[in-house]
């Protein structure tokens, strides 16, 4: 198999491992040249063949990569993003909750503009983002994003302080506010609302409702938008990652699609 592009994965958690596994299973011509971690002295299982461990963003310059893919959590976005973009590498972001910080988002956009690299925001657990983005070329009046997940998927988050997750017997709304506030308060579960917002009418106009449902087995996203284009109603019922119920399989799949599209001769 010939290698047509080298990438760096930032993070070796559930999403990073799943992306690497999918690329290997599909015999992709993309090579993972390095995996960025907090501490390279700690042992890591199932690293991609030939990948080296790095822990400092300054090490990106010597990696030979053209794309850096972040899947390590919100704190990693700025240091790794700035290092990648300022070096001329494209940077794909998984932890989009970082963009509730307008100054951070602007710094990355400025770094991309200065070097000519691209700041890439994949669809995360969603589909149809291209349609919402296209619709935003005209006036959009409203966008609502409803996120319904199994009660256990909200464990360990602020949801546990708002609703007794172990006791509810039916779908329970525990949060309704702007996308900015949702993604800031629930960075793992609701960061996808940032993608909806950036494609549509922004973080402060997009409304988000969060629901814990003890009967749910899938992670569900409903997006309703209205505007000059007409009306859009999107619904996705995603299987959770086997190793992390807070994330969807689709998140990893959309990252793989974005990576493979860079080397594909036909792009859909």
Swiss-Prot record:
Q: State the similarity comment.
A: Belongs to the L-aspartate dehydrogenase family.
UniProt keyword annotation of Nucleotidyltransferase present: no
Q: Name one GO molecular function term.
A: aspartate dehydrogenase activity
GO annotation, biological process: NAD biosynthetic process
Its biological function? Specifically catalyzes the NAD or NADP-dependent dehydrogenation of L-aspartate to iminoaspartate.
Answer yes or no on keyword NAD. Answer: yes
Q: In which pathway does it act?
A: Cofactor biosynthesis; NAD(+) biosynthesis; iminoaspartate from L-aspartate (dehydrogenase route): step 1/1
Taxonomic lineage is:
Bacteria, Pseudomonadati, Pseudomonadota, Alphaproteobacteria, Hyphomicrobiales
Listed A to Z, the keywords are: NAD, NADP, Oxidoreductase, Pyridine nucleotide biosynthesis
Instruction: List, from the UniProt record, the residues annotated as the active site of this protein.
Output: 221
InterPro entries assigned: Asp/hSer_DH_NAD-bd, Asp_DH, Asp_DH_prok, L-Asp_DH, NAD(P)-bd_dom_sf
User: Per its record, how is this protein called by name?
Assistant: L-aspartate dehydrogenase
Q: Name one Pfam family in it.
A: Asp_DH_C
What EC number(s) does this enzyme carry? 1.4.1.21
Positions that bind NAD(+): 125, 191
**What enzyme class is recorded for this protein?**
oxidoreductase
Q: What else is known?
A: The iminoaspartate product is unstable in aqueous solution and can decompose to oxaloacetate and ammonia.
Catalytic reaction equation(s): L-aspartate + NADP(+) + H2O = oxaloacetate + NH4(+) + NADPH + H(+); L-aspartate + NAD(+) + H2O = oxaloacetate + NH4(+) + NADH + H(+)
């Amino acid at each position: 198999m010939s290698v047509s592009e080298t990438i760096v994965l930032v993070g070796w958690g559930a999403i990073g491992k799943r992306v690497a596994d999918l690329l290997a299973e599909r015999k992709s011509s993309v090579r993972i040249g390095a995996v960025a971690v907090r501490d390279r002295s700690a042992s890591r299982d199932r690293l991609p063949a030939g990948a080296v461990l790095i822990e400092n963003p300054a090490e990106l310059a010597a990696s030979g990569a053209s794309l850096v893919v972040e899947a390590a959590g919100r704190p990693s976005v700025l240091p790794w993003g700035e290092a990648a973009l300022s070096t001329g590498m494209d940077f794909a972001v998984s932890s989009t909750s970082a963009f509730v910080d307008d100054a951070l988002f602007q710094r990355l956009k400025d770094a991309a503009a200065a070097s000519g690299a691209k700041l890439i925001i994949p669809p995360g657990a969603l589909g149809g983002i291209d349609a919402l983005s296209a619709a935003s070329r005209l006036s959009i009046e409203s966008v609502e994003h409803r996120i319904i997940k199994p009660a256990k998927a909200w464990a360990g988050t602020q949801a546990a302080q708002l609703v007794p997750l172990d006791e509810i017997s039916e779908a329970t709304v525990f949060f309704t506010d702007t996308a900015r506030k949702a993604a800031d308060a629930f960075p793992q579960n609701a960061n996808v609302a940032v993608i909806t917002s950036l494609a549509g009418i922004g973080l402060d106009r997009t409304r988000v409702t969060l629901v814990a449902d003890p009967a749910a087995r899938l992670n569900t996203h409903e997006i309703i938008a209205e505007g000059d284009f007409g009306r859009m109603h999107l619904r996705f019922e995603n299987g959770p990652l086997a190793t992390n119920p807070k994330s969807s399989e689709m998140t990893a799949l959309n990252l793989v699609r974005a990576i493979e599209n860079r080397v594909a001769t036909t792009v859909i």
